[in-house]
Amino acid sequence: MKNYHRSQELAPRDIVSRAIWKEMQRTKARHVYLDVTHLGATFLKERFPTIYSTCLRYDIDITEEWIPVSPSAHYFMGGVKTDLNGASNLPGLFAAGEVACSGVHGANRLASNSLLEGLVFGYRAAQAASMLLTTGSFPNLLEENFPRKPHGRRMPTQDVEKIRNSLRRLMWSKVGLVRTGDSLQKAVDQIQQWSQKLSAAPFNRPGLETRNMVQVGQCIAQAALWRANSVGAHYRDDFPFYKGLKWKIHSRCQQEVPAKFAAGITKNTRKTARS
């Protein structure tokens, strides 16, 4: 880590993740190694019992052997835009925890804040929802407000699964730890093609979930393409530095008919997600 940050192993998590990724790319390896053997068996077993037992199930004794390490998706810092009570702009819909964009995170997640965020906003959302049940009113949900099951030939479920698996690989390779304008544009173009194909997806759980995954992937890729700078976990290899006050804003993705992406914050709109 001395080649990547002056704090070495104590560097911010996004820098550590990119450092691991770059070493894996340089060496063509599937992982790097973490050596904690110097801490001693007693300390490791008492301080990290879950890690110790998990690695032991894979025949890795962390008191004597190095731990293979690879980056992965850990936390989503965007989400459904809510107020401080977990309320979204859809009456009666509340969100709390990692699914929500409540404003407590910036371009990086605050360390050890996940459980506290769920606890605080889960409690506030429950209070607000309870109050709404007794004092609020809900819109009349007419049948025409819901998507109708389209006619015609449906896409086979196995084709939906292929798109889902391909989307996962695309998001990791093109919209992952290190991004470029070229990789992001390719991702946006491919996701748009999948989005069109999925209009014929079956109205079952795999079909609906894959549609949602493609939609979220499109928002992430488009927001990352628009944000031509690097900040926190969003790292553009072609724009490695954070420059300009114009980037000190959130970006939102709002579904309309048809769905479209709005880069940045425009007049008379609400912020609904973070890039």
Residue ranges and their predicted role:
Residues 31, 62-70, 134-143, 200-207, ...:
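Flexible, glycine/charged-enriched surface loops at secondary-structure junctions
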Residues 90, 102-129:
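A conserved FAD-binding loop/helix module that cradles the flavin
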Residues 1-67, 119, 128-134:
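An anion/pyrophosphate-binding glycine-rich loop and adjacent beta-alpha core
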Residues 5-6, 104-115, 146-153, 172-176:
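Short beta-alpha connecting loops at secondary-structure transitions
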Residues 47-100, 206-228, 234:
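A glycine-rich dinucleotide-binding beta-alpha-beta segment and adjacent secondary-structure elements
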Residues 205-275:
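C-terminal amphipathic alpha-helical interaction region
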Residues 69-76, 137-152, 234-244:
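A glycine-rich phosphate-binding loop feature that marks nucleotide/adenosyl-phosphate handling sites
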Residues 131-203:
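Long, amphipathic alpha-helical stalk/connector segments used for oligomerization, subunit docking
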